[in-house]
Amino acid sequence: MFLINVTHHSLSQISEKFHFQKNASSYEEDAGATSTRLAAAALSYLPLRSYSSSSHILDSAAGPGIVTKLLLSPSPADVSVPELPVSPRPRVTGIDLVPAMVEHFKANKASLNWTTADAYVQDSEDLSRFKDAEFDAVVMNLGIFNLRDPVAGAAEMYRVLKPGGYAVITTWKTRRVVEILQGALDAIRPNSWLKPMYMPPEWLTKEKPSSVMEAGGFHKDQIETFEAEPNWECGSEEGIVKALNSPLWTSKIFEGWSHEEIGRWNGEIRKQLRDTEKKTGTLEMSAWICVARKG
């Protein structure tokens, strides 16, 4: 999932959980398309053709079920992974620390007829509800960098995977959205301490995800890292401005702001946009996909 928080990681987890509890209903609408494109790219590195109704996949830090939707429902037009959705449907279990996200997952399950899926409120670094060697794959899309102890999370993935199973994690490499949000924030409140969508800088590197997976028990020779470009497609300049005015991004930023300051937001967002972004309605985003196999 995306993240807005402060620089101290222990406080950021509390902030993040509260933020997504409050804004869970808007997450899929405002961030879902980009997250879906990245998740589809990540899933393309799994042996999808080998999965069947007897397979079991863990959607960890599942949010509203973006990974699960790709596995079980017809793909959106901008996703072209031939093996998606998987048929026959595998069993998919979704977990998320945010209760509202799990409720959203369950609502999607009901409306989209995910008869082979279920979801639970569960910390992704504590998979004690699951047995050893239970899953054929574990997928954590944009979640590993939010854990208190990412290595413990990786070790739990390793434990619950069957021998020969795959764990896939994703993290960002570049985030144009962050530059725009930060630029607008700094223009209005130059002395603010807030860092929208803050991530520890090391998580933007290619080396960090693979080092965490290796420390969690995966053999170095069984870890590969790939790059993806799941750009944020808003359709137009107005689409970008509208998207970056969503409470998903602004509810934390606007805390304590005056009406005058809030009124400046859209204008400052426009000032941050490059000419090509205004013409295309596209913001560049790139990401790392780390794939680890349990030997």
Regions found by a protein language model. Give the residues of each.
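N-terminal, positively charged/glycine-rich alpha-helical extensions of SAM-dependent methyltransferases
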Residues: 1-25
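Conserved alpha-helix/loop element of class I SAM-dependent methyltransferases that forms part
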Residues: 33-54, 70-74, 78
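Conserved Class I S-adenosyl-L-methionine
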Residues: 34, 66, 202-295
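A generic alpha-to-beta junction signature in SAM-dependent methyltransferases
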Residues: 50-51, 75, 86, 161, ...
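Class I SAM-dependent methyltransferase SAM/SAH-binding core
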Residues: 55-128
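A short acidic, Gly/Pro-enriched loop at the edge of an enzyme's catalytic core
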Residues: 125-138
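A short SAM/SAH-binding and catalytic strip from SAM-dependent methyltransferases
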Residues: 136-150
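Conserved catalytic/acceptor-binding region of the Class I
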Residues: 151, 158, 164-235
